[in-house]
């Protein structure tokens, strides 16, 4: 059983020639391996990107609560012209599907009411793409944006193994029945729970109770930040979400790649 639920969406750009403008949007639980597939270094799909090699990752979007959520985001990013979040924003022209077109679509998605409060991260691995992103203005809501050219290096140690070890530790600390620090009711094994991410605080709560306490002064469904009821530290909602799990989790996280991909647009062929 794999306890890590990391799943990201990514934007590729073809580097076949200096002026190549082909782009591709996909999703994966393992970006380094998926990039190798796109570039033909290992087998395993990615046939649609065969003619644009070599490819590089311009940016990744991650922090989704599960694979289904990531795939929903991926579909909307791939289909900006018909997505209900962007269909009124002039994304219908096929010739506009450049790197800037995709970044504008990404900006519209993360600024929408649906995703702006999700604990998402956007990491840029390419300076040019990051510069283009900054031209689009400030990102609102609960989204963090980073630039890190070396993000893929040590991916498994930084993301996969860290998450795996953290969740194993959480399971060990609450293997016995515990009570929610907010409602004082026993937390059942199949209920979502979240604990304070600080190691010197052992606060554990029902996820729903914690969300309600964070939303006492808000009219939204998803909170942004609040105070830990025990250590009194102010924390962002995303920090609590990183600790969420159930003790009865038995989901087998398989390496699943979405079949729905954005159509590759090679601008060189259109010239």
From Swiss-Prot:
Its EC number is 3.1.-.-. GO terms for molecular function: 5'-flap endonuclease activity; crossover junction DNA endonuclease activity; double-stranded DNA endonuclease activity; ds/ssDNA junction-specific dsDNA endonuclease activity; zinc ion binding. The keyword Hydrolase applies. Residues 5-87 form the GIY-YIG domain. It is found in: Nucleus, Nucleolus. Divalent cation. Mg(2+) is preferred. Has Holliday junction resolvase activity solely in the presence of Mn(2+). Pfam families: GIY-YIG, SLX1_C. Its cofactor is Mg(2+); Mn(2+). Its main location: nucleus. It comes from the Eukaryota. InterPro entries: GIY-YIG_endonuc, GIY-YIG_endonuc_sf, Slx1, SLX1_C, SLX1_endonuclease, Znf_RING/FYVE/PHD. Disulfide bonds: none annotated. A zinc finger (SLX1-type) spans 180-231. Belongs to the SLX1 family. Catalytic subunit of the slx1-slx4 structure-specific endonuclease that resolves DNA secondary structures generated during DNA repair and recombination. Has endonuclease activity towards branched DNA substrates, introducing single-strand cuts in duplex DNA close to junctions with ss-DNA. Has a preference for stem-loop (SL) and splayed arm Y structures. Introduces a single-strand cut in duplex DNA on the 3' side of a double-strand/single-strand junction with respect to the single-strand moving 3' to 5' away from the junction. This is Structure-specific endonuclease subunit slx1. It comes from Schizosaccharomyces pombe (strain 972 / ATCC 24843).
């Amino acid at each position: 059983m794999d306890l890590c639920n990391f799943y990201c969406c990514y934007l590729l750009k073809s580097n076949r020639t200096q002026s190549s403008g082909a782009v591709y949007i996909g999703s994966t639980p393992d970006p380094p391996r998926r990039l190798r597939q796109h570039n033909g270094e290992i087998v395993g799909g990615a046939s649609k990107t065969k003619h644009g090699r070599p490819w590089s990752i311009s940016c990744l979007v991650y922090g989704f609560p599960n694979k289904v959520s990531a795939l929903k985001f991926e579909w909307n990013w791939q289909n900006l012209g018909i997505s209900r979040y962007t269909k009124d924003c002039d994304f219908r022209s096929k010739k506009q599907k450049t790197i800037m077109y995709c970044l504008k679509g990404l900006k519209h998605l993360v600024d929408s009411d649906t995703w702006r409060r999700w604990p998402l991260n956007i990491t840029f691995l390419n300076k040019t793409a990051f510069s283009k992103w900054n031209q689009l203005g400030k990102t609102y809501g609960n989204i963090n944006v980073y630039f890190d050219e070396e993000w893929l290096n040590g991916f498994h140690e930084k993301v996969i193994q860290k998450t795996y070890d953290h969740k194993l530790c959480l399971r060990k600390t609450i293997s016995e029945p515990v009570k929610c620090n907010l409602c004082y009711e026993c937390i059942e094994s199949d209920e979502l729970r979240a604990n304070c991410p600080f190691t010197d605080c052992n606060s554990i709560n029902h996820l729903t109770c914690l969300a309600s306490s964070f939303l006492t002064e808000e009219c939204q469904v998803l909170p942004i930040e609040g105070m830990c009821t025990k250590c009194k530290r102010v924390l962002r909602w995303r920090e609590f979400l990183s600790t969420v799990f159930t003790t009865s989790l038995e989901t087998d996280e398989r390496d699943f790649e979405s079949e729905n991909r954005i159509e590759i647009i090679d601008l060189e062929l259109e010239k």
